[in-house]
């Protein structure tokens, strides 16, 4: 039977009663009973009498209960103290009479019935004797509730048992399905378009809050990382550990959308939607694309480009201009020169290749460098290794990028992109050199030389090639960073490329100035110099010729101890540095090869020079790390790159103190990776004139710049008073306020420990204490045994 014949038959057969129904117009009976005037007094009085009786009964009942409780209280009072002490023991919540009480299953009613009502009464009386009053009260309450429930329960059980399970609805048979299909096939289907909601820009506080919540969720995830069946890598690197669990497809899709939307918003809008902001943790675990696979995530770079206030590269949509310059040797990373120079985002899961504007995964390091500025585009990561170093998981690439400088080529040295990734993960060196400005972890290890990406063979990054040279600092052959500091230097020069397209590095030439053994592509002065030359030109900086002064580039301070003010972050302090977001480069240990050579180090720039990452203590107190990408990156940066995995993560933000110069162990910092501070957000300042290089007097100058007429009537007690106060504080606590004077509030907040941390600390010390006690006991036993042996041997000697 087909559809039409069914319809015909239905039309032919009228319903069972063919008689048409009509409405009757007759008025029906009234719905409510008519009200009778007057009151039926007898009924009302009877009702009132009944009520009074009930009230009296209740009062009597209450009185009896109260008397019973008072009597019990008297009984209990005499040994209350003993009982209180006993009730604090762990064994049981009742009083403790020396015999551990077995917790009885809570079937008071059932067991009572079996043993006879009298016995059950006695047992409850005994229990009650040992209970404190509050317990008694709660206990009696819950017992009465339980009794009521149990009385009600049996009938319910019987009722439930009868019907059994409902039979499942009969399945549609095939013909019905066909009919249904025929009916539905021509009906239009509503396609619900997801509404795209423009997210408003968020304030720093909101961002911090969001990040905090996200981290919280991540912690929960960490407990069961095997979600959706995928193994997820946890990136040790950044303070916020992102678990990326998303399927790679969704990642691709999302990144496409992001890139579309962000590229449209030019100059300006620097949209900080959280999604952009984090460039979503990408699914790291399962997608390690091998080197050459192509991966569309354009997002981070595109986003950058749109996203920051800076104007995206001249073309407007960060295009990777350089596609072609793909470093020949390097893993296929292709630097994207997209204007967005820095993606400082956090390393996104491996899959996301930050710079990805180039569109291919950066050698696995992808993630770690996710932050590499997109400009740098390719994390040089362990280049060879093919898997993201470390951070892979970390996932959120927050693009910080000041998007590219006007020239459209990446400005920040790879922009802050410091790949914060820390995990030693695949690469031998295991850890990306972290910030190494170039943003790409220079995990030397795998590739040995992590060859500079940029200029493919030539060793000098090609102009746009942007950070083009991820070159790992290690002498290429050596496979390990040269100079202890090695890793630090991974800083790519490329970025430094000035507007003109040639590296502005002080050295001027595209190639790093004298890296010791390395090929020219390597940054100079073994990392020590932290690529001194690679001074990325700050976005804003205009003159092509000179490295942007303010730019965050790390130029090693002449002294050689890198003074690290990370420029990027101290957003507060001087967010004015244009480049600030630019790159902070951790300097790796004090530069080993002497100070960087060549013009590059500019003494004046000291503060802005490299940031030391050491154990999270940044050398320059000034960098207020908090804000942007400037965060020091993985310790690996500190020259440790060779070390396998950092042992501990320093709390969220590195705390810098001016007078602390990390001690170098044969040139390496003994660094621990410092994690990214949770709340940080790249500091954005509108593109503007480049600031003069920040010199040691920068503090004074900034104070002048920040003069605010409204603050004229602000009453300040004056420095004198503060010093007095800090003197007293020092006397009491041995605390030196001056030491933290330049610290951002943000950093200081992380110096305080939370209650939870204290608890952890206590638990840890307790554990250690127990271990020590056990060891002592063992030692004592051994000593006793030895003494016994000696006695025996002495006796034997005597007997002979």
Swiss-Prot record:
Q: Which GO terms describe its biological process?
A: heterochromatin formation; nucleosome assembly; regulation of DNA-templated transcription; transcription by RNA polymerase I
> Which Pfam family name is an example for this entry?
SPT2_N
Highest taxon of source: Eukaryota
Composition bias, Polar residues: 260-272, 608-626
**Where, by residue number, does the polypeptide cross the bilayer?**
none
Q: Where is the composition biased (Pro residues)?
A: 684-693
Q: How does it assemble?
A: Interacts with histones. Interacts with a heterotetrameric complex formed by histone H3 and H4, especially when the histone tetramer is not bound to DNA.
What protein name is recorded for this chain? Protein SPT2 homolog
Q: From what organism does this protein derive?
A: Xenopus laevis (African clawed frog)
Gene expressing this chain: spty2d1
